[in-house]
């Protein structure tokens, strides 16, 4: 009887230990690590799980013919109020879908197409050469830096990429450093508040969450231009 009680106690302690390990949350000074969404990396920032980066294998989806209708990209670009001599950074440029639509509007300026995937930059370079476009330059960034010169950028565009930054604190600090003092950051993310937007939850972001994270990085929300079908068009400026 005594042995049975000891055995039962041992099993109970073991099960409690397993449960504790399964639910364990690791926290650093910046980020939290725990299991979450299947499409997330298990790393959290300010209550938001970071999503996996879409690989270059999805490049055809970026160039899909329905994209203008779904996202109204032409209106997004109008929202940026581009000037001919401006220097623009398209962060997470992917296939160059936005960069090549911006380039003709800054004919005296330049568009930096920044991505961490060399395959994406290779595709941009091929398009650039085939269309003889001279004011788009590719930049290989890293998970922590956009590798752009300090105070060189008038406007930054990030379309559905910020939520995939593995190191959002470091990346936004790098972007902020690259922006001119009066520069603007256009943060485009699928609206988490709108359940009708047919995108997975982890690939969406609410205005409240975006403002929370940008505020921590030293940015203020100037305005949220609410004229896109699925996305927020949030304009941030340095504090």
What feature does the model see in each segment?
Residues 154-168:
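A short SAM/SAH-binding and catalytic strip from SAM-dependent methyltransferases
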Residues 223-239:
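Core SAM-dependent methyltransferase catalytic element
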Residues 186-211:
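Conserved class I S-adenosyl-L-methionine
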Residues 89, 93-145:
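Class I SAM-dependent methyltransferase SAM/SAH-binding core
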Residues 8-16:
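Bacterial N-terminal signal peptides
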Residues 146-155:
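A short acidic, Gly/Pro-enriched loop at the edge of an enzyme's catalytic core
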Residues 24-81, 87:
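Class I SAM-dependent transferase core
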Residues 169-184:
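A short glycine-rich, Lys/Arg-flanked "PGG" loop and its adjoining helix->strand segment in the class I
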């Amino acid at each position: 009887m005594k042995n049975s009680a000891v055995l039962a106690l041992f099993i109970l302690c073991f099960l409690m230990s397993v449960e504790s390990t399964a639910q364990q949350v690791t926290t650093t000074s910046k980020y939290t690590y725990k299991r979450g969404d299947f499409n997330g990396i298990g790393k959290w920032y300010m209550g938001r799980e970071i999503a996996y980066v879409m690989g270059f294998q999805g490049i055809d989806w970026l160039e899909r013919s329905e994209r203008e209708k779904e996202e109204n990209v032409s209106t997004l670009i109008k929202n940026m109020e581009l000037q001919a001599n401006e220097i623009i950074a398209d962060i997470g440029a992917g296939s160059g879908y936005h960069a090549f639509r911006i380039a003709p509007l800054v004919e005296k300026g330049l568009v930096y197409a920044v991505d961490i995937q060399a395959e994406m930059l290779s595709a941009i370079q091929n398009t650039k050469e085939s269309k003889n476009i001279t004011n788009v330059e590719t930049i290989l960034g890293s998970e922590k830096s956009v590798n752009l010169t300090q105070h060189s950028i008038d406007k930054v565009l990030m379309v559905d990429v910020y939520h995939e930054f593995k190191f959002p604190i470091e990346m936004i600090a790098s972007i902020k450093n690259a922006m001119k003092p009066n520069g603007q950051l256009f943060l485009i993310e699928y609206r988490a508040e709108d359940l009708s937007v047919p995108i997975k939850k982890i690939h969406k972001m609410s205005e409240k969450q975006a403002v929370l994270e940008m505020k921590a990085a030293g940015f203020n929300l100037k305005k949220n231009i609410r004229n896109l079908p699925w996305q927020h068009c949030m304009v941030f400026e340095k504090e």
